[in-house]
Curated annotation (Swiss-Prot):
UniProt entry keywords in alphabetical sequence: Amino-acid biosynthesis, Aromatic amino acid biosynthesis, Lyase, Pyridoxal phosphate, Tryptophan biosynthesis
Subunit record text: Tetramer of two alpha and two beta chains.
Gene name of the record: trpB
Record has Transcription regulation as a keyword: no
Pathway membership: Amino-acid biosynthesis; L-tryptophan biosynthesis; L-tryptophan from chorismate: step 5/5
GO cellular component terms given for this protein: cytoplasm
Protein name listed in UniProt: Tryptophan synthase beta chain
Superkingdom field: Bacteria
EC number: 4.2.1.20
Broad EC category: lyase
GO-annotated molecular function: tryptophan synthase activity
Family matches, as InterPro entries: Trp_synth_b_CS, Trp_synth_beta, Trp_synth_beta/beta-like, TrpB-like_PALP, TrpB-like_PALP_sf
Organism in which the protein naturally occurs: Klebsiella pneumoniae subsp. pneumoniae (strain ATCC 700721 / MGH 78578)
């Protein structure tokens, strides 16, 4: 089947789905391409981002964390967005696309619950019926977000199969969509999955990097030495990276979760420690066994607990344009505490991985003058109970 947009990033990407879903993906691609050229669609999307979601988000300079170093560190404050994370950006775009296609229902999957909350709020706003698949384990560890979704009228469906986490929720959501695509839109939550989702999600998140570029030029008069973002599926990172890819003097650093340590096998770092396979409708690196079964990923942060990664990140990694590193649970926890204590900002555990790498860069080169931007992709309200229990068990509180 020919496509309007290139479905691949190098060798990665594609549309590996049952034949029954091909018409739905084709319809989605056509709607997206026409919407991108439609001034009325763009005006409505921009208006929602500004007057409902609260864009542009701030670029905040850290006053205290950089003490004793020559680093200047800024945070792109996606945590200030309505809904609490960057997820709100692209769901507003997808919800408008769903309406454009005449769909009346939204299907979504969620890990940390942030995409679920965003899907629920966009559905409530635009009058769409919403059902959200969530791994049973994540339902337990993200109870505040589950209640938020239900409060906004969404049906939350716990998934008990497999590892009862995000990958299983993704499978159930796709299964649902294959039987209901005529009236339902699958609102995929990250820059992964079958074409055209990775491209759609990137384009509906790219304002993160566009705003950052304008803001840093205004504040510092130059581009940053590096932009840093956490990577699960990769939507906040590709949103930050997209406008900087051509700026080859700006480093792009994606941070995967090392969990209990790469050597433990309990991590979520497929880019550096997985191998290429087919999963979730795409060809991309993933964590898999010797016989090709998808391995369980692990991270303290539910939103990074995903065994694969978006195909554009795989491409940027393969070409060397972006560097991908990993941060352990403990390092992310330390960054979570440090930002809370020294800047009065409680970050999501996902975003804490990106911050932890920036802090590591500062510590390793205290005399190096460097201008860094971390994408603070979400706020940590949803994680305070998880962190509280860990710190209590350690006797730190």
């Amino acid at each position: 089947m020919s496509t309007l947009l290139n479905p691949y990033f190098g060798e990665f990407g594609g549309m590996y789905v049952p034949q029954i879903l091909m018409p739905a993906l084709r319809q989605l691609e056509e709607a997206f391409v026409s919407a991108q050229k439609d001034p009325a669609f763009q005006a409505e999307f921009t208006d929602l981002l500004k007057n409902y979601a609260g864009r542009p988000t701030a670029l905040t300079k850290c006053r205290n964390l950089t003490e004793g170093t020559r680093t200047t560190l800024y945070l792109k404050r996606e945590d200030l967005l309505h809904g609490g994370a960057h997820k709100t950006n692209q769901v507003l775009g997808q919800a408008l696309l769903a309406k454009r296609m005449g769909k009346t229902e939204i299907i979504a999957e969620t890990g940390a619950g942030q995409h679920g909350v965003a899907s629920a709020l966009a559905s409530a706003l635009l009058g769409l019926k919403c059902r959200i698949y969530m791994g049973a384990k994540d339902v337990e560890r993200q109870s505040p977000n589950v209640f938020r979704m239900r409060l906004m009228g969404a049906e939350v469906i716990p998934v008990h199969s497999g590892s009862a986490t995000l990958k299983d929720a993704c499978n159930e959501a796709l299964r649902d969509w294959s039987g209901s695509y005529e009236k339902a839109h699958y609102m995929l939550g990250t820059a992964a999955g079958p074409h055209p989702f990775p491209t759609i999600v990137r384009e509906f998140q790219r304002m993160i990097g566009e705003e950052t570029k304008a803001q840093i030029l205004e504040k510092e008069g130059r581009l940053p030495d590096a932009v840093i973002a956490c990577v699960g599926g990769g939507s906040n990172a590709i949103g930050m990276f997209a406008d900087f890819i051509e700026e080859t003097n700006v480093g792009l650093i994606g941070v995967e979760p090392a969990g209990h340590g790469i050597e433990s096998g309990e991590h979520g770092a497929p880019l550096k420690h997985g191998r290429v396979g087919i999963y979730f409708g795409m060809k991309s690196p993933m964590m898999q066994t010797a016989d090709g079964q998808i391995e369980e990923s692990y991270s303290i942060s539910a939103g990074l607990d995903f065994p694969s990664v978006g195909p554009q990140h795989a491409f940027l990694n393969s070409t060397g344009r972006a560097d991908y590193v990993s941060i352990t649970d403990d390092e992310a926890l330390d960054a979570f505490k440090a930002l809370s204590r020294h800047e009065g900002i409680i970050p999501a555990l996902e975003s804490s991985h990106a911050l932890a790498h920036a802090l590591k860069m500062m510590r390793e080169n205290p005399e190096k003058e460097q201008l860094l931007v971390v994408n603070l992709s979400g706020r940590g309200d949803k994680d305070i109970f998880t962190v509280h229990d860990i710190l209590k068990a350690r006797g730190e509180i």
